[in-house]
Amino acid sequence: MAESHGNAHGATAHTEADGGHKAPFPPFQKETFASQLVSLTIAFVALYLISSRLALPRVRQTIDDRENTIKGDLAQAQKLKDDSDAALKAYEAELAAARARAQAIGNETREKLNAAAEAERKALEERLSVKLADAEKTIASTRAAAMSNVRGIASDAATAIVQQLTGATPDSKLVDSAVDASMKG
């Protein structure tokens, strides 16, 4: 029924009906169309039954498992988020309490140090006052000793000056009275 014709490029095969014209494409032949629809329906029903009984339950189970896993993961993530939020709040509260304690300790320490510094300053002032009083006494006694020596030195110097200028030794009582008058003012 089929003839093979050659051409310049090689041999090709095609189907021709008797009489020299081509036969229609087999799925579109009117004579076999009804049986093809029945075969297609049977194949579709069989494929549907196989997939609905075997494949679709597995796919549905996989989807359900996946959905349950996602829900579980989301619930666990929410729980962990809530736990971390609670831990953060507790941390912030503890941090605020620690800051308050540190502030109180700092204030208490500052007050203690200020009191200690004040007490030490007063003690130092007292020691310095005692030393100052002792120094003033020492200065006064040194001044008195120096002044008594100054009177003698001034008398000796005045006597030496008068003797040098006049060539005669002056009266010591007269020199002492002149030095006393000069020292008083």
UniProtKB/Swiss-Prot annotation:
Family: Belongs to the ATPase B chain family.
Membrane topology: Single-pass membrane protein
Species classification: Bacteria, Pseudomonadati, Pseudomonadota, Alphaproteobacteria, Hyphomicrobiales
The keyword Cell membrane is assigned to this record: yes
Protein name listed in UniProt: ATP synthase subunit b 2
Renumbered residue ranges of the record's region Disordered: 1-25
Main location: membrane
Keywords on record: ATP synthesis, Cell inner membrane, Cell membrane, CF(0), Hydrogen ion transport, Ion transport, Membrane, Transmembrane, Transmembrane helix, Transport
Keyword Cell membrane (UniProt): yes
Matching InterPro entries: ATP_synth_b/b'su_bac/chlpt, ATP_synthase_B_chain
Known partners and oligomeric status: F-type ATPases have 2 components, F(1) - the catalytic core - and F(0) - the membrane proton channel. F(1) has five subunits: alpha(3), beta(3), gamma(1), delta(1), epsilon(1). F(0) has three main subunits: a(1), b(2) and c(10-14). The alpha and beta chains form an alternating ring which encloses part of the gamma chain. F(1) is attached to F(0) by a central stalk formed by the gamma and epsilon chains, while a peripheral stalk is formed by the delta and b chains.
Protein's cellular compartments: Cell inner membrane
Protein purpose: F(1)F(0) ATP synthase produces ATP from ADP in the presence of a proton or sodium gradient. F-type ATPases consist of two structural domains, F(1) containing the extramembraneous catalytic core and F(0) containing the membrane proton channel, linked together by a central stalk and a peripheral stalk. During catalysis, ATP synthesis in the catalytic domain of F(1) is coupled via a rotary mechanism of the central stalk subunits to proton translocation. Component of the F(0) channel, it forms part of the peripheral stalk, linking F(1) to F(0). The b'-subunit is a diverged and duplicated form of b found in plants and photosynthetic bacteria.
Any one GO molecular function term: proton-transporting ATPase activity, rotational mechanism
Gene: atpF2
TM regions (residue ranges): 34-56
GO cellular component: plasma membrane; proton-transporting ATP synthase complex
